[in-house]
Swiss-Prot record:
It comes from Caenorhabditis elegans. It catalyses: sn-glycerol 3-phosphate + an acyl-CoA = a 1-acyl-sn-glycero-3-phosphate + CoA. InterPro entries: GPAT/DHAPAT (IPR022284), GPAT/DHAPAT_C (IPR045520), GPAT/DHAPAT_LPLAT (IPR041728), GPAT_PlsB (IPR028354), Plipid/glycerol_acylTrfase (IPR002123). Keywords: Acyltransferase, Lipid biosynthesis, Lipid metabolism, Membrane, Mitochondrion, Phospholipid biosynthesis, Phospholipid metabolism, Transferase, Transit peptide, Transmembrane, Transmembrane helix. The HXXXXD motif is essential for acyltransferase activity and may constitute the binding site for the phosphate moiety of the glycerol-3-phosphate. GO terms for biological process: CDP-diacylglycerol biosynthetic process; glycerophospholipid metabolic process; triglyceride biosynthetic process. This is Probable glycerol-3-phosphate acyltransferase, mitochondrial. Belongs to the GPAT/DAPAT family. The gene is acl-6. Signal peptide: none annotated.
Length: 718
């Protein structure tokens, strides 16, 4: 059967964290089928195209008629007077040395630089143009109408909405606004980097809701210029929310260059939290949003992943990008939008404060060294301090991590990602097509069992051949396909492309992957201590904390690792991956957490499956090894050198084979994104000096030698 991309394996809308935000007595809406926004104009929007399949579409001037007939009923007041007269801005002006008149003029300039100027007429025109753009770029643009109904109900409460999408493509800026217009929701004010405020185009973005923020501020700030700028920006966000207008910004701060969620930044979310804490607004809804693309319109960021600096946006570059994107029809394939359940910020503040406070005493002291592992006991990236109270910075980090985790976990998986995952983690060479198709079905079932959803896949119904056929059309540049065999093309760009797609799958199996890697790094048949597996898995999580979000702030990572080992798939007495040394005594009761004892891998088939899971994260551990070994070698400069130059040099030398390694590196492990995160974690743990910002020099730290030795142990396949 062909892929039914509008179907879904998830039949109920739910909050992924029902520990923090239980639904209580609410009736959970059922999710029906996704609807295609590109079809709305053909049916005049109402009823939805899926309601009456017998109705034939009316294509004559459909987009034009629909765009002008759907009203923009909401009001978007100008907040300039409110911002410039706010207490926050006046307080900053009164502190500065220059005359008040000069500072007031500067404040007006900053407001003009930042503010959106939303125009209903321009939005109407753009809504029509975007129909043409999206039809060219996409096969379908799918949303869940039940999710939109939940958003509509939340908006009717009068509490402002804050949309927090993951960031994959520049198209992300357009999708929420366009989707909200279809469903009669308010159009958001969208935080955009000032790099997009281009001559001749900035006004158009402002007219559709964009407000621009500086990507960098002056760290010296002798004249208080940036202090005033921050006050204007902060007050602008407060005033927009106080007028019940929604805001949209990307917690990650920038587009993901490698296909996975980034750790959140604290900037704009801290302004929203402060506005609620200080009572400027009573509350707001936080709405996680994510997107599933078969391919992003910009393509893979290959040059940036090789350490080549990003070219700053320009008007000419925009037109080049448009021409490149339009040169191939349906480049993005099927695109899905996912909206999480709106949660009030006050609920986040209450539940996360309670969770972090109650769990604090059970967390081990940071940097408690293990004798046989190569890191530390717990991953607490949102909890850097050890005071008895939860400070504001910790709270803001926790909220950011919680929202991004929710967004990544509700994201559907593209068939392109499923195929890419198998090509890299299981079959890196030639494999028969029939075997590969069966494995596609197997992996889709695993994703569904983990609570995920694969676009177009219906459990026990969809054939792997349909998935493979669909995905290969999008991967023709990096996969060799015949009627009998499948294999990836042997080039760095091909493996990077496949890795970009594969990385969206890892969040479903991240904890399983690190556990599997600790197991397969030991010789076959070796007795495995459960305590040691857990400690080594936590160590790997710690070292990969800037690559993946393994759990929510309210979760205990240690408990989750134990729970995975206790799952039926792992501990079933007959079919589990692991066999207890005392199974005959009734030790294993599949489904409960395992806390002690010794285990063995059951058989060769179980080890093969564990090897697949381990290979999901192996490239990232290899990247950490490559960076660690490079910064202690003679190839690394002795004087502080910019991180970008270090990374670019390492990429070039690794691909040229100029670096001696005890293993053959996976080509996808050679990329700037993973190297940056590796440098970041080495500096975070004090293994590299931070004397010069964004720079690295050769290190003689003895702890690096210990790390390298232990990484070699983990990366060795036995």
């Amino acid at each position: 059967m062909e892929l039914d991309v509008e179907s879904t394996s998830i039949t109920q809308l739910r909050s992924h964290c029902e520990t923090c935000f239980p639904l209580m007595e609410e009736v959970v809406p059922r999710r029906e089928r996704y609807v295609d926004l590109l079809e709305f104009s053909n049916f005049n929007g109402i009823p939805y195209p899926v309601v009456d399949p017998s109705r034939k579409p009316r294509r004559f001037l459909a987009d034009f008629r629909y765009s002008w007939s759907i009203p923009l009923i909401h009001h978007y007041p100008n907040v300039e007077k409110d911002v410039l007269s706010s207490k926050r801005v006046h307080r900053v002006i009164s502190k500065l040395k220059e005359q008040n008149d000069e500072q007031k003029n500067r404040a007006v300039q900053f407001f003009t630089e930042i503010s959106a100027r939303l125009s209903k007429f321009i939005c109407k025109c753009c809504s029509y143009v975007l129909y043409k753009v999206f039809r060219r770029l996409m096969d379908k643009l799918l949303v869940c109408k039940e999710e939109m109904e939940v958003l509509y109900e939340a908006e009717q409460t009068g509490i402002p909405m804050v949309y927090l999408p993951l960031h994959r493509s520049h198209l992300d800026y357009l999708l929420i606004t366009w989707c909200n217009w279809h469903f009669g929701l308010k159009l958001p004010h969208i935080a955009s980097g000032d790099n997009l405020n281009l001559s001749g185009l900035g006004w158009l973005l402002r007219a559709t809701g964009a407000f621009f923020i500086r990507r960098r501020v002056d760290p010296d700030d002798e004249r208080g210029k940036d202090q005033l700028y921050r006050a204007i920006l902060h007050s602008y966000i407060e005033q927009v929310l106080s007028k019940d207008m929604p805001i949209e910004f990307f917690l990650e701060g920038t587009r993901s260059r490698f296909g996975k969620a980034l750790t959140p930044k604290n900037g704009l979310i801290s302004n929203v939290v402060e506005a609620v804490q200080h009572g400027f607004i009573k509350d707001c809804y936080l709405v996680p949003v994510s997107y599933t693309y078969d391919a992003v319109v910009e393509g893979i960021f290959l040059h940036e992943l090789m350490g080549i600096p990003k070219v700053r946006e320009s008007v000419l570059g925009v037109f080049r990008g448009i021409f490149s994107g339009f040169s191939k029809s349906k480049q993005c394939g099927v695109v899905r939008m996912h909206y999480g359940r709106p949660i009030r910020l006050t609920e986040y503040l209450a539940t996360i404060t309670a969770s972090l406070s109650s769990n604090h005493r059970t967390r081990p002291v940071r940097m408690t060294k293990l004798s046989t592992s190569f890191s530390y006991r717990e991953l607490v990236p949102w909890h850097r301090t050890h005071s008895e109270t939860v400070d504001d910075r910790t709270m803001i980090r926790a909220i950011g991590f919680h929202v991004v985790y929710e967004a990544q976990m509700m994201c559907s998986i593209s068939p392109v990602a499923v195929v890419s995952c198998l090509l890299l983690a299981k079959w890196r060479g030639k494999v028969s097509r029939s075997t590969f198709e069966r494995d596609c079905e197997w992996l889709c079932e695993k994703i569904i069992a983990e609570g995920g959803d694969v676009v177009g896949y219906q459990s026990k119904k969809t054939k792997g051949s349909a998935l493979v056929k669909y995905a290969f059309e999008k991967l023709e540049s990096c996969v060799e396909v015949t009627d009998e065999y499948v294999s990836p093309k042997e080039s760095h760009s091909s493996f990077i492309t496949l890795a970009y797609n594969k990385n969206s799958v890892i969040c479903r199996f991240s904890i399983k992957s690190v556990i599997a890697l600790t197991i397969v790094s030991r010789p076959s048949g070796t007795k495995l201590s459960i305590d040691q597996i857990v400690e080594d898995a936590l160590s790997l999580c710690d070292w990969l904390q800037f690559e993946f979000m393994f759990c929510r702030p309210c979760d205990s990572l240690r408990e989750l690792v134990h729970n995975v080992l206790g799952q039926k798939e792992w501990s079933d007495p007959i079919h589990g991956f692991l066999r207890s040394e005392i199974e005959d005594d009734g030790f294993l009761d599949a489904g409960g957490a395992l806390n002690s004892g010794t285990l063995r891998v059951r058989d060769a088939k179980s080890r093969e499956t564990l090897q697949f899971f381990a290979n999901l994260v192996r490239p990232f551990v290899q990247s950490l090894y490559l960076i660690s070994s490079f910064v202690v070698s003679e190839k690394c400069p002795t004087e502080p050198t910019s991180d970008n130059n270090i990374i670019r040099q390492l990429c070039q030398q690794s691909l040229a084979g100029d670096i001696d390694l005890p293993f053959a590196p996976l080509l996808e492990s050679i990329n700037s994104d993973s190297f940056k995160n590796a440098l970041r974690v080495l500096k975070d743990k004090g293994l590299l000096q931070r004397s010069t910002p964004n720079s690295t020099a050769r290190s003689g730290n003895s702890r690096l030698a210990e790390l390298i030795s232990n990484l070699e142990r983990v990366l060795e396949v036995k």
